[in-house]
Amino acid sequence: MFCFQCEQTAGCSGCTGKAGVCGKTADTAGLQDELTGALIGLARACANNERKETTDRIIIEGLFTTVTNVAFDDDSIKEMIDKVNTEKSKIVPGCAACASRCGNTDNYDMKRMWEADEDIRSLKSLILFGIRGMAAYAYHAMVLGYKDQEVNNFFYKALFTLAEDWGMEELLPVVMEVGKVNLSCMALLDKANTETFGTPPPVTVPLKVEKGPFIVVTGHDLYDLKLLLQQTEGKGINIYTHGE
């Protein structure tokens, strides 16, 4: 395996071998790369073909699935890969049976990116890891019924870029655009959260651990937390979480 997505990566250079510092196995890392390659293939298929109503959601879900510590279950990643490939076959149904394949909609082999020139690999990694984090924000906004088409469109552009043999001069503007669009995505999530749950005021947070059963939650999906609080109301179950 090779992964240097998080700040805990081994030796500040990358996790290799059978497992990463986070506990992710080589098999899981390989599936995440396969999923990313499938998402790039889907984005390439959409370059000259009309998307389906479901395509944006699948792109966002797929990218979110590859964020550190989100999904280390191999079966769920395989299901996501199948979902992405099925979506692509709906958009370009004739490609799989084409007698003279052009390769324009093929899934991308991530080894090409990991083995590229150091500077190119670094710039493409900034793009990839940036849109993965952005997808988390977009997903949380999406489940609350909010979306920004500019943000959604950029996911396709960024994924398409990863498969191109571009130099630093062409990649740097895309890296800068990741930051610009991510700011719009953060504004989208802020709007979704504040219009749904209200503007959060400063409060004192109790640190006492109460007696009785409890559930510990990590992450920042406020909608899931709301549902969990509703389902445990009056049952004597305490919910503990932390801010991200």
Q: Which sequence ranges carry the predicted segments?
A:
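Metallocofactor- and cofactor-centric catalytic cores in central/energy metabolism, strongly enriched
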Residues: M1-E244
